[in-house]
Swiss-Prot record:
Source organism of this protein record: Burkholderia thailandensis (strain ATCC 700388 / DSM 13276 / CCUG 48851 / CIP 106301 / E264)
Site (Lowers pKa of active site Cys): K168
Location of the BPL/LPL catalytic domain: 59-240
Gene Ontology process terms (BP): protein modification process
Reaction(s) catalysed (UniProt annotation): octanoyl-[ACP] + L-lysyl-[protein] = N(6)-octanoyl-L-lysyl-[protein] + holo-[ACP] + H(+)
Annotated catalytic residues: C202 (acyl-thioester intermediate)
EC number(s) on file: 2.3.1.181
UniProt keyword terms in alphabetical order: Acyltransferase, Cytoplasm, Transferase
Name the UniProt record assigns to this protein: Octanoyltransferase
Sequence segments annotated as region (Disordered): 1-27
Additional record remark: In the reaction, the free carboxyl group of octanoic acid is attached via an amide linkage to the epsilon-amino group of a specific lysine residue of lipoyl domains of lipoate-dependent enzymes.
Homology family: Belongs to the LipB family.
One GO CC term, this protein: cytoplasm
Length: 255
């Protein structure tokens, strides 16, 4: 999923004029986060659904996290440079989207989590939301003995040390519309990394991209996804809320 100059998030320039009087107003209480497991879903379907969800929000709409795995697709942020797609005939579709950031790849074996969060109701600055998302990813990787860090000016999460020092393992890009976020993050678990060779990941030529498996982690997609959901809830609503998550919220059956 910072101010307008930060590549993490793309604010809606028309938000101050296009919002209806009800859009994302601040009710007194924070509503619980709903977790939805969408299985393998085409990117376009999720893109359309999260925009529609955000446009239809009212002060009573609860926040949601959508967890999904996409078929192969490249996505290019709204200020992205198409030149960062190095192989035009790769066979992987390219979708231009309205998030911040440049080009990235989504595919099988990668967790994608979309964060549909009412920042106004939570009284959150965008930079604070980004920091909490990043921290959730760092904590998730740490649960599998993988040390990772942020990089100033380079959205995403990177390997801290070892043979793959500095390689990217997670990506982040948000859109803010009427005080509410959509888009989110991706974590590479165990995937075919070759499609990343056809792009400059997030606009950085020669940037190595890795997954958890190539770093020695053997956890499967669903296990890592459950860990990520817990850490996202903990960083958004606190450890008590994460501990109180019903089992159904951690099962791939409520899509």
């Amino acid at each position: 999923m910072p101010p307008a100059s930060d590549a993490h998030a793309a604010p809606d320039a028309a938000a101050s004029t296009s919002a209806s009087p009800q859009s994302c107003a601040a009710p007194p209480d924070t509503l619980p986060v709903t977790v939805r497991w969408l299985g393998e879903t085409p990117y376009d379907a999720c893109f359309d659904a999260m925009r529609a969800f955000t446009d239809a929000r009212t002060p009573d709409t609860g926040d949601e996290i959508w967890v999904v795995e996409h078929p192969p697709v490249y996505t290019l942020g709204q200020a992205g440079n198409p030149a960062h797609l190095l192989v035009a005939d790769s066979g992987v579709p390219l979708v231009k989207v309205d998030r911040g950031g440049q080009i990235t790849y989504h595919g099988p074996g990668q967790i994608v989590a979309y964060l549909l969060i009412d920042l106004r109701r939570r009284k959150l600055m965008v930079r604070t939301l980004v920091t909490r998302i990043e921290q959730a990813v760092i904590e998730t990787l740490a649960a599998y003995n993988l040390a990772s860090v942020r990089k100033a000016g380079a959205p995403g999460i990177y390997v801290e040390s070892g043979p793959h020092h500095g390689a990217k393992i997670a990506a982040l890009g948000l859109k803010i519309r009427n005080g509410c976020s959509y888009h989110g993050l991706s974590v590479n678990v165990k995937m075919d990394l070759r499609p990343f060779l056809a792009i400059n990941p997030c606009g950085y030529a020669g940037l190595e991209t890795v997954d958890m498996a190539s770093l020695g982690a053997t956890a499967d997609w669903h296990e890592v996804a459950r860990t990520l959901v817990r850490r996202l809830i903990a960083n958004l609503d606190g450890a008590t809320a994460a501990a109180a998550l019903p089992q159904q919220a951690l099962e791939q059956s409520n899509d």
